[in-house]
């Protein structure tokens, strides 16, 4: 059995998957905020409960935001303060007496989608998350590409290309990102960026779901906004796809529920790619909130 954990600032979620990659059991508990000992206990107790339930010693994979293992072997995860700065992988491996694997939660999302029954035919899969931020991951032949710093797929921290400024106007404001850089595309293409763009052009403060509801009602202003957003997304993705050249692009995160993104993006992409380039197949993520757990569990399928 494959045990996959999706760990965030508020919850530790476990999914147990069988050899056919089907979910058999799941459970979640609150994430301890201050005590590392309590954090380890929470994870280990879930593993032990699963072992007893299924009568096997399952493999353990964990998806967590941040850098799963820094140069000194410790975790860096600002949203999980109880475990950040601690040798999480080594401690759990020792306590559970098995190989525990960690990866970035965005990489786990991409891995989950790459191992979908329909998508395993594609050698290079790119996962793109359009949610609170913009991130993603790359999977090549069923294995995540992580890089030495686990920042492969941090697409949101690429800067706006010159074509974006041609589209939006050269007086378009370059916003300072939380990472400290100016003009990161996350500030414009995330759910918050989607809302910020609307406020910037129309001087109305609405959340993304409210804007999308107006678009669905045929509101002309919302329609113009969505067209502008999709054009900007296509410009930025054109740069990324020219580097990555994936066979399949899977879009997740809250904005992926807005079907216009996946249905209309394909029309816009070709003009931003090299003439010889083939645009990837574009799909919405298939596994929703379960994606992080699935991908974490499947870290043990990548040998």
UniProtKB/Swiss-Prot annotation:
Keywords: ATP-binding, Carbohydrate metabolism, Kinase, Metal-binding, Nucleotide-binding, Transferase, Zinc
Reactions listed under catalytic activity: N-acetyl-D-glucosamine + ATP = N-acetyl-D-glucosamine 6-phosphate + ADP + H(+)
Keyword Metal-binding among record annotations: yes
EC number(s) stated in the UniProt entry for this protein: 2.7.1.59
Molecular function via GO: ATP binding; N-acetylglucosamine kinase activity; zinc ion binding
Keyword tRNA-binding: no
Matching Pfam families: ROK (PF00480)
Stored NCBIfam families: PRK13310.1
Functional description taken from the UniProt entry: Catalyzes the phosphorylation of N-acetyl-D-glucosamine (GlcNAc) derived from cell-wall degradation, yielding GlcNAc-6-P.
Listed name of the protein: N-acetyl-D-glucosamine kinase
Gene source species: Salmonella dublin (strain CT_02021853)
């Amino acid at each position: 059995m494959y045990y996959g954990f999706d760990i965030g600032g508020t919850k530790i979620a476990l999914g147990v998957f069988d050899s056919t990659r089907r979910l058999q059991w799941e459970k979640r508990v609150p994430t301890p905020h201050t005590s590392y000992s309590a954090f380890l206990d929470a994870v280990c107790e879930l593993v032990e409960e699963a072992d007893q339930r299924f009568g096997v010693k399952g493999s353990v994979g964990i998806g967590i935001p941040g850098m799963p293992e820094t140069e000194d072997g410790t975790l860096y995860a600002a949203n999980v303060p109880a475990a950040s700065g601690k040798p999480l992988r080594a401690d759990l491996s020792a306590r559970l007496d098995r190989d525990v694997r960690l990866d970035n939660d965005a990489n786990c999302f991409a891995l989950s989608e790459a191992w979908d029954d329909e998508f395993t035919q594609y050698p290079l899969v790119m996962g793109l998350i359009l949610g609170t931020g913009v991130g993603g991951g790359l999977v090549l032949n069923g294995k995540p590409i992580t890089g030495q710093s686990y920042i492969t797929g941090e697409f949101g921290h690429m800067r706006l290309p010159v074509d974006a400024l041609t589209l939006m106007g050269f007086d378009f404001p370059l916003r300072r990102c939380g990472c400290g850089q100016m003009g990161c595309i996350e500030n414009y293409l995330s759910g918050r960026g989607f809302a910020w763009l609307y406020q910037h052009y129309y001087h109305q403060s609405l959340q993304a779901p409210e804007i999308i509801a107006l678009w669905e009602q045929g509101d002309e202003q919302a329609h113009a906004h969505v067209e502008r957003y999709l054009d900007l997304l296509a410009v930025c993705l054109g740069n990324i796809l020219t580097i990555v050249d994936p066979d399949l692009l899977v879009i997740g995160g809250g904005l992926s529920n807005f079907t216009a993104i996946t249905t209309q993006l394909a029309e816009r992409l070709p003009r931003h790619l090299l003439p010889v380039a083939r645009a990837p197949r574009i799909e919405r993520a298939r596994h929703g909130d379960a994606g992080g757990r699935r991908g974490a569990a499947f870290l043990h399928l990548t040998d």
